[in-house]
Amino acid sequence: MPISKIHSRYVYDSRGNPTVEVDIVTETGLHRAIVPSGASTGSHEACELRDGDKSKWAGKGVTKAVANVNEIIAPALIKENLDVKDQAAVDAFLNKLDGTTNKTKIGANAILGVSMAVAKAAAAEKRVPLYAHISDLSGTKKPFVLPVPFMNVVNGGSHAGGRLAFQEFMIVPSGAPSFTEAMRQGAEVYQKLKSLTKKRYGQSAGNVGDEGGVAPDIQTAEEALDLITDAIEEAGYTGQIKIAMDVASSEFYKADEKKYDLDFKNPDSDKSKWITYEQLADQYKQLAAKYPIVSIEDPFAEDDWEAWSYFYKTSGSDFQIVGDDLTVTNPEFIKKAIETKACNALLLKVNQIGTITEAINAAKDSFAAGWGVMVSHRSGETEDVTIADIVVGLRAGQIKTGAPARSERLAKLNQILRIEEELGDKAVYAGDNFRTAINL
């Protein structure tokens, strides 16, 4: 079924910044997608086109990207008369229209909005849910797998004040029997965590960051992990709920010195206290020995490949090492990471690569190498729930979409609750097998 109309506009994301929304009209009606955006972005990501006009939205406007959809993509794609069910052909056409390697001409945010809306239109035409269409596109087997939610409950790094260098601490309810129960456990721990945080750090420490986690004035990773393990214990889930970290260490890597500055938010940081990657790797190993850590994302900087390979080699496969800034959902970097044994899991962000087809291929490349795949939101999110359907359709088994707070985060988690209810016994919960869910 061809497309009769494509229209884009700007709307606002969860940080109050403009972002791209795309409507596609076919015989089945209107299909809408909204594109997210990140705060700590990898330097190799596909180009998110912003206006750069400092007099409006501090340069973060997306009127150029919107115009590119309305004036370049819309007439060309409608004229091409492609079937919306042929996602690969649509995405290839969009990439050809752009003609650059990282979508700098039209903008990945413009292209992705169209790509996502096309997938929704195709699902409607096939009269199946979006997750079932994604499953068809990626050729995954049945039953469907419901993901373990990685809930970011304590924020540090670039997402928060305080001196804590690591960006995210997540709870992982992998011991639950179902997604519904995992959500309940996670929500209960989150409530305990909020009240503990207020008790220890004062009332205002209960305020939440961009992704719904608390951001108290914490100095060290141990302090954050103690707070979380205490909350897990108070909620009665010790042993069932694990912990994950996203270090986002590119944010505090000093490239010239090849060292890491754990006090990077202090303008007068003491250079003599900056540490080597070996010292940082030792810290991770000590933390993993003391706390139930099952996954560490971006433990080293995106260009510090040597550090990644060293850590992979010396840490064994006890926990998941996730590449985000390292791999930026890009087939070239994923291939390099596989060859150099840099990590064993991919963080999949559709807006890092810019089309549904390329996101699916990135996941398939990762699965083929025996990696895990974690589907992820961005810190600037919207009410769009496409990634909830993607994680189920891909059988990825793990999703990172913030704390059980703030509607733009819960929109995705609530969508997975609905999917679980709809599928009933035609789905299994990934649980402790989240790293190898594709094989379940």
UniProtKB/Swiss-Prot annotation:
The keyword Transferase does not apply. Substrate binds at residues 159, 168, 297, 324, 376-379, 400. It comes from the Eukaryota. Pathway: Carbohydrate degradation; glycolysis; pyruvate from D-glyceraldehyde 3-phosphate: step 4/5. GO terms for molecular function: magnesium ion binding; phosphopyruvate hydratase activity. NCBIfam families: eno. Homodimer. This is Enolase. The lineage of its organism: Eukaryota, Fungi, Dikarya, Ascomycota, Pezizomycotina.
